[in-house]
Amino acid sequence: MYDAVPRDIVTTATCNRCHDPLAMHGSRWQSPQACSQCHNPTRNTRFDALIHAVHSAGEAGGHDFSEIEYPTDIKDCQVCHTGGTPTDAFPLVATPNAALVCDGTGRGTTMLEWGDIDSFEIRLNAVDGTLFAKYPGGPGSQETGKWIEDGTVFYLNDMASGETIQKLTVNNTALGCVSNAPGASRGEPGAQHTNWMDHPSRVVCGSCHDHSDVNFETGENHSEFGIVAPDDNTCGNCHVPYSGKEFDRSVAGAHQMLYNSAQLPGVIVEFKEVTNTNPGDAPIVTYSVKSKKGKIIPADMNRLRFVITGPNEDYDFYVLEDVRSGSVQVGDDWVYSFNTPLPMDAEGSFTLGLEGRNVVPVDVGNEISDERDVAEPPRLAFAVTDATAVPRRMVVDDAKCESCHVNLALHGGGRRDANYCITCHSPGLVDIATPSESVHMKWMVHKIHRGEDLENGYVVVRSRGTFDFSDKVYPGDLRNCDACHVNNSQQLPLPDGVLPTITEQAWWSPTMPQAAACLSCHDGDDAAVHAYTNTTFFGESCSTCHGEGKFASVDRVHAH
């Protein structure tokens, strides 16, 4: 029996955002703190190095993890080392940081929070700068006004000694102005969550960076200077925890993610109005576009394309138009008239969406690089024959996708938000194979996440290559539909108007909507025969047994 208290660096709740739940060695061990009792620094599978190696597809303790595919960027340390609360090493934090700016003023608001420290003062932009706050001691918080600019620095000074305890840089962002911001979905911070920044070591850092063949003893491949690091005490000489600069050699700077760099002005598009929306008419869209720093001219953008899809019961119409040159300025807004009309037989409500980006210069540490600054895609439902617009049902919440993927951005990074993806990945969308494979959203996402457990695999052929998802391993429990679904959208029966899926590589095509949802995961012949015998040309009878509250309801057969 020992009195040792494990460090609180990464919480179980954070692990369970993907692992759902974390459970190893017969499911007995279910927390990082428990795991680290055995996987301690005396072993070649010490926990910190082991976890880094597993998630970065490396090697640890003689085990090869090269087949592991991490669902987001491995450089984003705060996916696991979730921050946002004061620690002993960093007693002052700003929430949010970066501060949200959606009005183009370049100025935001944040809340400063501090831990239990003795008498102190907080000054602006210099050790003797303008006084912001002064307290005799203890934890607390104070909101700033709307004057935070990129690079605002708060100095936390000890009033007794006059020494600066911490310098905190706060920036601004436009991420989150339209939808849930990439990277905003984080776990629960541990009490020592900044340990990754203030305790660099050769073993822990090398467990991720072993692919570059760094030899700390000789200095080989350890920077262009071949720096020798005989022990961990030398790491902090170059790799200070945090400098306030992006993409430098500080621990935080070296792991700065491009998508939330303060150097990106952001692209904020707001749909103001859609008119001329009767069947057969070409819609007219009024919109605004700006960055955190001010207005943007559409013609100057690298890309700005509007999407119209519908009807919102389930999409089978899709049009995409470049709006940059055709937009006309009216006051502070812009107006674009679609060239393509709505179908003559259009009914109900339709949806307007977009994809857009700028290319901007970013100082990435040792060079200026042109990088994409991508807009978050707003969506707007508009009425065609409905009295008022009826949005498409929400099947999944993109925040749940981001819980594991953190910055889910596909097709060059410009397609974000699962509820925008469905505007293109509709029931009739297929790849270029012969016969074709469905890339309908539910069929595709179910199959990708089922991966190696599929009986028949899943391969998508596109013009730029063939993509085989048959070896993917889902890190959680696939029976937990709520990991992705919202509003009981996985329950049967599905709403009226949901369309069949074109599935030419499956047993028959099209596959009726309820069967398509089930057979995309349960892809064996037995399941297909069962679905087929309970389907007729005019409908499905799945809900007779699998409906909500029935003896074999979706919840019951997926109980976990």
Identify the role of each PLM range.
Residues G84-T85, D213, P241-S243, D525-D526, ...:
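Acidic glycine-/aspartate-rich tracts in secreted/extracellular proteins
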Residues A229-Q263:
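A eukaryote-biased signal for short, well-structured alpha-helical docking elements
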Residues T87, F216-G219, E246-D248, P298, ...:
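Extended hydrophobic-aromatic, low-complexity segments
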